[in-house]
């Protein structure tokens, strides 16, 4: 499909198999999964269903077991996956694994791809991306990175503390950001592949966050003289921040894709309730205040999708996408939050329950305005670039 063209008819055709799979195979399992909690046993079960349907990791390279979908097609598939809180997990297109797959596909050596990317795509293990640190370390400002990598004979020793590391508990390996140390060390950050069995990789407690949609939660991690060989360096030493952009730009957009699907689900549930519930002798959906909530959601869903498809096409055409993805992430994270908030209001008491699913989506989606950079950090960067363009003109 031409990257510059994606029509509603295209989206309907591309998304239909995923839509049918989510409706028939995944949504019926939601309440049981919410009650029991998400774990690797559930992940394996769900991913087997997706594999049987030919829908496992549709966005990943075909040569490593994925579906090989381009980025424009992925915008449709991942939105449909996000229609259920379990959908991205089932289809192996959830964070952080989806972003790590893309990073490995672009940056890793052939040996690293066979060792890490192939089993990750197949769902044989999970991964995590370890950059965020306790203050005053790396967070919204990644250049504040404090984790150190000291060069020794045959490899590196990693030391530092990480937190909010999504999926760390139970992950098979981590991609760790660290700053090289030593007289001949390259400036800047470097990336290292660390196996979960490394004695210096210590996963602590899971942080109790309002979202509950990730297997392995968000954990504190310590690195204490964690030795990795020279073959564990991912990409070029000293180019970790540049390599991180390879991951972060698409990851911002795939977050948008999944959460757009979740927001649409919350809206659909609320509208269905409004159409069938009577209030003060009239259908709820006929009341002016309810109609405003519904209409505003309809408008913002279309606006989110239009912006997302545009930026996905630009990235597919080779645009670096740093600013484009930043703008999309701010707008879509905030708009989907508003959409789900209106859905809660429209659904009333049912809107705050997991039984309606809206409550689950509401708790999960709030963190989207913080993940992959808070809105304020993105706005500051967008504004700086705008001023710089005027000054250069």
Question: What residue ranges belong to the model's regions?
Answer:
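Alpha-helical interface subdomain recognition
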Residues: 1-85, 94, 107-112, 119, ...
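N-terminal glycine-rich flavin-associated loop
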Residues: 89-111, 139-141
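A short, Trp-centered hydrophobic/proline-enriched beta-strand micro-motif
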Residues: 123-133
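Hydrophobic, small-residue-rich alpha-helical packing segments that form membrane-like cores
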Residues: 136-141, 156
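A short, charged helix-loop
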Residues: 219-246
């Amino acid at each position: 499909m031409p990257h510059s063209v994606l029509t509603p008819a295209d989206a309907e055709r591309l998304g239909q198999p995923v839509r049918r799979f989510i409706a028939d195979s995944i949504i019926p399992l939601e309440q049981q999964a919410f009650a029991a909690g998400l774990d690797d046993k559930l992940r394996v079960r769900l991913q087997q269903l997706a594999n049987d349907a030919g829908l496992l990791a549709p966005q990943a390279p075909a040569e490593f077991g994925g579906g090989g979908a381009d980025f424009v097609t992925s915008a449709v598939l991942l939105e449909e996956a996000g229609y259920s809180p379990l959908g991205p997990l089932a289809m192996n297109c959830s964070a952080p694994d989806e972003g790590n797959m893309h990073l490995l596909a672009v940056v890793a050596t052939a040996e690293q791809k066979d060792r890490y990317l192939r089993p990750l795509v197949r769902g044989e293990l999970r991964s995590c991306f370890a950059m965020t640190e306790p203050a005053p370390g790396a967070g919204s400002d990644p250049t504040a990175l404090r984790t150190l990598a000291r060069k020794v004979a045959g490899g590196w020793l990693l030391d530092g503390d990480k937190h909010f590391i999504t999926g760390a508990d139970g992950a098979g390996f981590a991609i760790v950001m660290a700053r090289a140390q030593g007289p001949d060390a390259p400036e800047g950050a470097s990336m290292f592949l660390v196996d979960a069995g490394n004695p210096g990789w210590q996963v602590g407690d899971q942080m109790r966050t309002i979202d509950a949609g990730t297997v392995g939660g968000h954990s504190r991690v310590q690195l204490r003289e964690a030795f990795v060989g020279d073959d564990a360096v991912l990409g070029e030493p000293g180019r970790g921040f540049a390599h991180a952009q390879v991951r972060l730009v698409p990851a911002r957009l795939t977050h948008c894709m999944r959460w757009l699907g979740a927001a649409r689900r919350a809206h659909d549930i609320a509208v269905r309730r409004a159409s069938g519930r009577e209030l003060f002798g009239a259908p709820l959906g006929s009341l002016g205040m309810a109609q405003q909530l519904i209409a505003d959601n309809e408008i913002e869903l279309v606006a989110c999708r239009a912006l997302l498809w545009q930026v996905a096409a630009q990235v597919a055409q080779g645009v670096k996408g740093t600013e484009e993805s930043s703008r999309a992430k701010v707008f879509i994270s905030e708009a989907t939050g508003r959409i789900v908030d209106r859905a809660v209001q429209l659904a009333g008491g049912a809107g705050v329950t997991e039984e309606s699913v809206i409550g689950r989506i509401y708790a999960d989606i709030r963190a989207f305005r913080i993940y992959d950079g808070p809105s304020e950090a993105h706005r500051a960067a967008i504004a700086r670039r705008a001023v710089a363009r005027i000054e250069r003109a």
